């Protein structure tokens, strides 16, 4: 629950982290956006939180996660990395499901939601890029 995260990560314990959740209903359900979980993590110091509203197909969320992580490792911002995945797999999981030949999608589409600093980058990747630029 949001209360758990708020209590567990007080005083900036998550300083500058990027949190990617591939769980169902992280940002709410039945099409109703609920940012309480993300807000709790951001109040604990997270730079950016990405998750899904509604129930999400596992393969879609896992594929989006891998695409996002790989782009973050390549130096993209969180927004750029998620956009890369969206371009690859579709704006929501029902688009992805139908493109896979699915015939009976679930009732409400799931899509990624971002909160916090969408321009955040992985610190180690950013530090390496900065040192490369300084050397040049």
Residue ranges and their predicted role:
Residues 18-130:
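Active-site-proximal C-terminal subdomain of hydrolase catalytic domains
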Residues 1-28:
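Mobile, glycine- and charge-enriched loop segments
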């Amino acid at each position: 629950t949001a209360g758990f995260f708020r209590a567990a990560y007080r005083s900036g314990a998550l300083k500058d982290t990027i949190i990617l959740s591939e769980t169902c209903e992280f940002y709410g359900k039945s099409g109703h956006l609920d940012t309480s979980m993300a807000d709790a993590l951001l109040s604990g110091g997270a730079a950016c939180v990405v998750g899904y509203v509604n129930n999400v197909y596992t393969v879609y969320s896992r594929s989006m996660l891998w695409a996002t992580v790989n782009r973050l490792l390549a130096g993209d911002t969180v927004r750029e990395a998620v956009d890369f995945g969206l371009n690859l797999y579709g704006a929501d999981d029902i688009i992805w499901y139908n493109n896979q030949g699915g015939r009976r999608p679930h009732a409400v589409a799931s899509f990624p939601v971002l909160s916090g600093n969408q321009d955040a980058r992985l610190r180690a990747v950013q530090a390496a890029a900065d040192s490369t630029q300084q050397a040049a």
